[in-house]
Amino acid sequence: MRSLNRIVMQKASRDWITSLGPERLDVAEISGRWGEGMGFRSHQSFHYPRHDPCTGPFRDEAGKVQKFDLIMANQVWEHIDRPHTATRNVYRMLRPGGWFWVAVPFFIPYHAVPVDCSRWTARGLTNLLIEAGFDEARIQAYQWGNRHVARRNLETPWPPEYREGDDLTNDPDFPVVAWAMAQRG
């Protein structure tokens, strides 16, 4: 199923990530598998609750903080209790020059998996990333959506599947999803 809510975000994000040269990147993905098959040098998935970014950076068997070139969090941050703490922990796990990519919903139904805590616009994501230590000049954030997509989110079953002819025009005043890439200095 191609989710209507994710179709624009995924295309833009895949283009961003491809521009980084995936074959050179060691990647961590938090509670997801979207990055599988992108041709990374290495890709590890870290799933909650065994790996909770709110409790600290991920560590190896020797207790050393693991380091990555890219950390991905796709539709996860809205489900964690302490996103500011988690984002600071992500910053600690990035190598110098490493990237954090995060995508979150804004205008969609409540969906507890196991909880549903937060929503962000592009500006909200930018502020979250700055507060975690990222330099504002190294952050790119976007949002996308429109009233048509918002109405489709009221349908069941949810989430809505993309249908040929769905309006993908962006209405900046009606975001459905937001995403950002931030680079550690």
What residue ranges belong to the model's regions?
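A short SAM/SAH-binding and catalytic strip from SAM-dependent methyltransferases
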Residues: 69-81
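Conserved N-terminal segment of class I S-adenosyl-L-methionine
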Residues: 1-72, 175-179
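Short amphipathic alpha-helices and their capping/turn segments at secondary-structure boundaries
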Residues: 17-21, 87-92
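S-adenosyl-L-methionine-dependent methyltransferase catalytic module, highlighting the catalytic core
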Residues: 3, 81-89, 95, 99-185
